[in-house]
Amino acid sequence: KTQIADKKHVVDAEGRVLRDNVWGPQIEDAARRDFTINAMYFDPVTQTVVDYHGGLADARGRVLRMIGDPATRYREDPVRILRVVRFAAKLGFGLDKATEAPVRGMVPLLANVPISRLFDEMIKLLQTGHALASLEQMKRFGLVGGGTPIFPVLEAALGGGSAARETFVRLALEDTDRRVAEGRAVAPSFLLACLLWHDVQDRWTAIKAQGEAPFPALQQAVDAVFDARIGDISGRGKLAADMREIWLMQPRFERRTPSGAAGLAAQPRFRAGYDFLRLRADAGEASSALADWWEDYHLGNDEEREALLADVKPASGPQRVKRAAPVASAAPADDGDADEGAETDDDTPPAGEGE
């Protein structure tokens, strides 16, 4: 490629590159790469590696080294800090002293990066198959719990020093790493639903304490958490809808009635909701027996489902409300028929809730 003279290299007052469409020969391209291990080229004619910055030696030594002056490079693009974290976690490489030294002091520069870009980078960090290692690196460099709220989702997930939160998040990230290792897809909506679940629970409890009914309270809690932690990002509508479904299914799993169970199992995102329930059971905040029951119900045939429902003990409190038969009726019904079809299942949420 040849250099285009009318394109400019533009930076802001803090040194962040705003526009950079100037390019040149291969040696200049190599100098613009982030790390030495990313600045190697293979020549298919001579079957040799062209290495301008000692990347091969660093790869063999398992060292992550920034090309150029690290502080300047971080100022040019603060997202390079997140790439340091991602590469170190994914490859298991150590950082050379010059690359590592400025990182903590540069973290506040990430506050100038658009929210949508930070969100995308966070998802990348957690979907490499090394989410737990990435989280440890983020803690190490002050990206989480360091006083600068770069990732509100992670701050909420780990906030308050709650052992229950940390256990649930750790299990969720372990599950994410396992899925990636098995070559299975990891939906961002499921991962985010896990990270923000306890935040939703806290707000749900607070809203119910104000006298709101459970399902409307949960919907309000979901909206509040999403606005506070996710914000205005691309694909917000689909992401919010998927997360909402997963969360709203959780209280419905507790109510196992014939119509309610069949309707829930038929939901398109039932499996995601069930996987979330299983994760909660593994963390000790939901019943393992309940998770087992739903697994059996989901996989069972009609007869097996009927048997499972028959084994369910009635929950405490009012379960069914029977309406009185109409005063004017054409003829008396046989015993047991008057209320046929007139029962309402108190466990079924109002229309539009959780569906």
Task: Identify what each model region corresponds to.
Residues 1-355:
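Catalytic cores of the polymerase beta-like nucleotidyltransferase superfamily
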